[in-house]
């Protein structure tokens, strides 16, 4: 127990030291900064929902961001971003109980060196890719919820390099370190002090593009009960392969497929598939329709049939005016015969945005990772949000 505690403390201190080194490097360049820009987002919201009982929440979020640009000779560019994710909320449960939550944590802390056809970015950053929109098999390093007006998601610590060819092909290479908590669809985090490596190649094809992606890590399943089939005491080598493509034909079409192998796990093969399409109808100011089919399954072999989950998703968007639009998103769980409903009426101004949202969901929200427990967005409810961007 003491050794585990010491490892956790060491890992946390190691991580903080890494962040301090990056911040120190950025701030040491501050005297050479060509220009600095401070911007950010302030959002306040209120939610009322009913599942087994009436619950409500009030909250505020502040995401300040400092962008720095440094002069570099020739055609190169050196810039950085430092931002925080701060929030405070109070949840009021019917009865008398109240739960308060508040946190301040780094959101983005990175330094980037770039040229006309390449970029190298180091630090706490957002890395996402793929063709799908609502249910994304390639959601490996983020947890963006398409219903969230702020599109908030944690970043990952790592080094990312990208090269862009003249024909719009591009190559990505990354190395991640210190991301011990689960991310994306992961059921378990990464083993402490073990790096993650991967890359992606994307090339134009016909009227669109196609890509192949690979990632390797060593997963940590020790948090599970020792009697659980997914428990494993040692680092689990995990290899991921993904392919995706998007094409602009009479309608927009895309696909994403992922195959994951976890050595030593009983059901160590995972398969993800997404097929999607979108089209804008010439009705009024333009009615946009998007639909996706998503499936996820685990098995002891790569391509045998086994139990899993599958969802169908539909998104409809209609702009009433230049500043006002209505969006509806529906998910259908084929296995449990559950229907998830979400409606968002938004108003967009220069600096202000307002949202009126309604949802009608099962008591247990099971669409996205990290939301498998009963939460405030389960059941039926409404949410209002005001956002100020400066």
Identify the function of each model-found stretch.
Residues 207, 246-332:
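Detector for outer-membrane/organellar transmembrane beta-barrel domains
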